[in-house]
């Protein structure tokens, strides 16, 4: 349901609107705040860190600007809708630039694939690798479109609050191969092993193992082709700033350094929050954008809850992330905005990461060069980069205080030997984020990068619900609830609130 734009508020008297407290200022929390403000709530967003954005915060070092987390904007209409709820157009505040290609996928021997939304170009790329797989590729994309139509367009913003709602879609899940893994679905259409890798890697963008993630996530291929892959000029942080501006324009409040210690529950209902310093903030509803495991395991304290400690410990978490941010005193014009560098192993590496929780000697990498599109993110004649390696989450027991620098050096050597010659001698600034930082900064369970692993038994009804099963007037948004991680996922989780949160009733 698309709520109409809120009318300007009369600020001459006291604000009698019902109060909504949003815990966390990630994209899920910010989008929820905008939607609630548009529906008549007075909104307060509480962020424990010293800047907005959660995983989408911004690092500024030595004249370089680095987006900390999300860099790939798909389904931009989900952002545009938030601006329209406030009677504005996003294009007046944010410049989105389409990427062409979306990514360049590079294998160890130097063979590369330019992945884009151009149908003719994609057929030609597939034919370069395996001419006999072109018909299978076309059939796979038709399948992806069918899955996207149901899994994203029809169900992505629908709450799964009870078991019957899940049972109703079971026939669709079977018909669309939701019980198979993404890799298995791709392999039904495509025979060339490298092409199977190219068309099955997408679950890694939301923390999933292509060999275990539900085949429903094959929808990502069509989602990207339909709505494109974009970059926000100025960085993803510009989207965070834009949403914060919308919230303020609605009369909402954003507070940094506000560490929520617990959600106050009285008579089975959420009635506000208590900060670490002892301050109590009353609320009519509470929306948590915190990690769902932290919400249920810590913020609700001793409250009776279905997602109890034992259930949380049994759940499968997404992978961890090792991210190295660096700036160079030279430019690398031959490097695309988004590059995926595949290592020597695919299935074996993912087994090490997700099952064995072993930090392998080899790795696959995602390299982000935002200055390919926006040179102002670095000093003149310089480039800004971040490189991300999927790694085990903290269940693997790795000591990142000891392992981080040797691992970074191995990544640097791999980049220097492939796409960034002379890298070591060109570094101007350098720092890393590890799974331990995800646990410390974002209170992420097991230091995972994306919350729960996106497998079928942890999807839709099987995830923590958008409306708490245990506490009235408590709602969840973000990667840890339905529909899941990634920008389209967390923005859609806020969209679900339109169906489960009552409209504000303002006293006369």
PLM regions and their residue ranges:
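A glycine-rich dinucleotide-binding beta-alpha-beta segment and adjacent secondary-structure elements
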Residues: 192-206, 360-366, 421-483
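Extreme N-terminal leader/targeting segments of oxidoreductases
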Residues: 1-21, 38-39, 455-462, 468, ...
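C-terminal segments that line or cap access tunnels to active or ligand-binding sites in enzymes
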Residues: 329-437
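Helical element adjacent to the flavin cofactor pocket in flavoenzyme catalytic cores
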Residues: 219-276
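Mid-domain catalytic core of redox enzymes
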Residues: 2, 16, 261-379
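A conserved FAD-binding loop/helix module that cradles the flavin
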Residues: 70, 479-501
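N-terminal glycine-rich phosphate/pyrophosphate-binding loop and immediately adjacent elements
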Residues: 13-149
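Rossmann-like flavin
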Residues: 106-213
């Amino acid at each position: 349901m698309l709520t109409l734009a809120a009318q300007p508020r009369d600020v001459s008297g006291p604000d009698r609107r019902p109060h909504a407290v949003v815990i966390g200022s990630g994209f899920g929390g910010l989008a929820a705040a905008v939607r609630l403000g548009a529906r008549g709530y007075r909104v307060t967003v509480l962020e424990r860190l010293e800047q907005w954005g959660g995983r989408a915060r911004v690092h500024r070092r030595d004249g370089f600007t680095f987006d900390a987390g999300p860099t790939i904007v798909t389904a931009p209409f989900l952002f545009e809708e938030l601006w329209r709820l406030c009677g504005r157009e996003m294009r007046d505040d944010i410049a989105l630039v389409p990427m062409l290609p979306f990514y360049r996928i590079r294998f160890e021997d130097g063979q590369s694939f330019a992945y884009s939304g151009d149908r003719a170009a994609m057929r030609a790329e597939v034919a370069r690798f395996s001419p006999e797989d072109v018909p299978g590729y076309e059939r796979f994309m038709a399948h992806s479109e069918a899955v996207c139509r149901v899994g994203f367009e029809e169900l992505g913003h629908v709450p799964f609050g009870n078991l019957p709602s899940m049972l109703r879609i079971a026939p669709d899940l079977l018909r669309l191969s939701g019980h198979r893994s993404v890799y298995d679905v791709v392999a039904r259409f495509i025979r060339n092993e490298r092409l199977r890798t190219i068309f099955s890697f997408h679950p890694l963008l939301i923390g999933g193992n292509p060999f275990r993630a539900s085949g429903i996530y094959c929808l990502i291929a069509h989602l990207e082709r339909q709505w494109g892959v974009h970059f926000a000029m100025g960085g993803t942080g510009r989207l965070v700033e834009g949403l914060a501006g919308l919230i303020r324009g609605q009369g909402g409040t954003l507070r940094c350094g506000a560490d929520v210690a617990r959600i106050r529950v009285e008579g089975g209902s959420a009635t506000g929050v208590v900060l670490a310093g002892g301050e109590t903030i009353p609320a009519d509803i509470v929306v948590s954008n915190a990690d769902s495991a932290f919400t249920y395991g810590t913020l609700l304290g001793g409250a009776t809850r279905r997602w109890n400690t034992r259930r949380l410990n049994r759940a499968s978490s997404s992978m961890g992330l090792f991210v190295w941010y660096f700036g160079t005193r030279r430019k690398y014009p031959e490097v695309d905005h988004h590059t995926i560098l595949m290592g020597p192993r695919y299935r074996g590496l993912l087994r090490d990461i997700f099952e064995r929780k072993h930090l392998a000697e080899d790795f696959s990498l995602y390299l982000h060069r935002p200055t390919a599109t926006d040179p102002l993110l670095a000093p003149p004649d310089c480039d800004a980069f971040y490189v991300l390696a999927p790694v085990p989450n903290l269940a693997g027991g790795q000591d990142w205080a000891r392992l981080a620098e040797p691992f970074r050096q191995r990544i640097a050597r791999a980049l220097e030997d492939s796409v960034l010659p002379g890298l070591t001698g060109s570094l101007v600034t350098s720092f890393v984020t590890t799974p331990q930082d995800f646990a410390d900064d974002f209170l992420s369970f097991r230091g995972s990068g994306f919350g729960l692993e996106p497998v079928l038994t942890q999807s839709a009804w099987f995830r923590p619900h958008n409306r708490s099963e245990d506490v009235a007037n408590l709602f969840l948004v973000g990667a840890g609830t339905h529909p899941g991680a990634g920008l389209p996922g967390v923005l859609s989780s806020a969209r679900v609130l339109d169906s489960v949160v009552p409209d504000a009733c303002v006293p006369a």
